[in-house]
Amino acid sequence: MKPLTFLTTAYLRRLFPLLLLPMLGLASCEDNVGNEAEYVDWKATNDKAFAQRMAEARTAIAEAKSAYGDQWMDHCAWRMYRTYAQDERVAGIAADSICVRVIASGPAGESPIYTDSVAVNYMLRLQPSVSYPEGKVADYSGPFPSPESVFHPDFAQPRSFLTSNTAEGFTTALLHMRPGDRWEVYIPQELGYGAAATSNLPAYSMLTFDMQLVRFW
């Protein structure tokens, strides 16, 4: 069951970058990426990329609803979820939501709530840049930065943390996942780290997670 919260989005955006950084092993927000040439027009690039993903999701969802009605989720891999930190009755914008492409679905069951702990396999990839045409892998949970090691049952090393101790967009995804679900999650910079920069993560980065919920408790 998705928990209800009425904490302000502004407060959460100040709080969550401080909480998620230790979990993902990223450097302090005081660090500077230090290579502006690598990330030319980075904010515009990332904002455009997220808008394209949202447009793709909206089109696919609309077509599935038109063709299959209430059963559309059985025929469409795309989902969009409003941030848990915002009352759904309030009008929002695209950057108030995450965009999800379902890779694999676990068995029917419950989802974590805000106060639960979770174990997650994940890879975090940035948008393509000068030196990384496929996007830099900024962090990952397994022994090597490849899906074959991160998600293989013999090699996976899931990380455990509180559902609440992650970036706003990451938490939003977890609250909708069930054990066994593997999703590609697109998080706009507004629900990620925003203007904060680290040694691995430029400011204004859209976060693209390949993530799998292993269990929660």
Residue ranges and their predicted role:
Residues 13-18:
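Sec-dependent signal peptide recognition
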Residues 24-28:
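C-terminal motif of bacterial Sec signal peptides marking the signal peptidase cleavage site
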Residues 2-7, 29-217:
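Cross-family detector of peptidyl-prolyl cis-trans isomerase
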